[in-house]
Regions:
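A Rossmann-like FAD-binding core segment of flavoenzymes
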Residues: 2, 68-165
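Short hydrophobic core segments
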Residues: 2-14, 53, 132-142, 185, ...
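Redox-cofactor binding/interface segments in oxidoreductases and associated redox assembly factors
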Residues: 9-10, 52, 126, 139, ...
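FAD-site-proximal beta/loop scaffold in flavoenzymes
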Residues: 24-45, 119-125, 130-191, 281
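Mid-to-C-terminal Rossmann-like scaffold of FAD/NAD(P)H-dependent oxidoreductases
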Residues: 172, 180-261
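A short, polar/charged loop-to-alpha-helix boundary motif
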Residues: 261-280
């Protein structure tokens, strides 16, 4: 037993394995740790057809790495599009086209019935009856916070540990910091040491590298139907480059860069500084 005056709870998260029949077969894997990567590298040696369940950033990155190994790869996504809610429709279309040009099959709006096989994976059966051939399945279906210890200790938790603006839990002196969230950790550590800092939520952003392209999306990219956004777009379909900026009340609120992300730092700063449409047009 280790007595403490202050404690920081930072046990991270684990890959979510959906309750699909066959998810325990030897050729079904997740990719989160170095050990996971080493296991997949070994499985790839005897595989020809791979299925990635999940069409988010990590799923597409996994699909690309498997394709580079020479496997036939299919991505299965339950949502109507890849990266649902994370990027806008023009970007989805272009990114899907890039993936298909690289030989990756994309199936969206599908539900998984089971992973087929007895001792080895033989395919993934869809709810509609179709079976996608596979001898390797990668699950990329999100993560879940590790909250069992927190709950046992009496910390309030929902899908994650619940904290206030100081990153303190419902138990005085115990703080929690989110998985891979450096700023959260800094605030929690400072407050545990006696400071009184408040956490300021960061602007949501995602980045993707693979399939010979790169993607960066940040902020509000037109996801709220009630807001009359203005958009500015620069598109080069031949070179598969897209820049799209979203404005609300004349202020930059979000942006997407595809194919050329060299200006991501500039765009991030512009959103933080609440640059106007006029100011941004002057830089185009």
């Amino acid at each position: 037993v280790y007595p403490f005056d202050k404690c920081i709870y930072a046990l991270g998260a684990h890959s979510f394995v959906p309750p699909i029949k066959g998810n325990d077969l030897p050729q079904v894997a997740v990719v989160r740790s170095i050990a996971d990567v080493e296991r997949v590298n070994a499985l790839v040696q005897d595989a020809k057809n791979a299925v990635v369940i999940g069409g988010g950033v990590l799923g597409l990155e996994a699909a690309w790495e498997l394709r580079r190994f020479g496997l036939d790869v299919t991505v299965l996504e339950s949502a109507p599009v890849l990266m649902a809610g994370k990027i806008d429709t023009p970007t989805v279309r272009m990114l899907t086209g890039i993936a298909e040009c690289k030989g990756i099959s994309i199936l969206t709006g599908v539900q998984i019935a089971e992973i087929s096989g007895t001792e080895r994976v033989t395919g993934v059966k869809l709810a509609g009856g179709e079976t996608v051939a596979a001898d390797l399945v990668i699950l990329s279906t999100g993560v879940r916070a590790n909250i069992a210890v927190a709950q046992a200790a009496g910390l309030a938790a929902d899908r994650a540990v619940i904290v206030n603006e100081n990153m303190e839990t419902n138990v005085a002196g115990i703080y929690a910091a989110g998985d891979c969230a450096q700023e959260m950790g800094r605030i929690a550590g400072a407050n545990a040491a006696g400071e009184a800092l408040s956490y300021q939520p960061e602007i949501n952003a995602l980045s993707f590298h693979g399939m010979g392209t790169s993607l960066y999306a940040i902020g509000d990219i037109g996801t709220r139907a009630e807001i009359p956004y203005k958009t500015v777009e620069i598109k080069d379909e031949q070179n598969q480059v897209l820049r799209r900026a979203y404005f609300h009340h004349g202020i930059l609120c979000g942006a997407i860069l595809l194919g050329d992300t060299s200006r991501m730092a500039e765009v991030t700063a512009a959103i933080q500084e609440k640059k106007t449409l006029k100011e941004m047009l002057e830089k185009v």
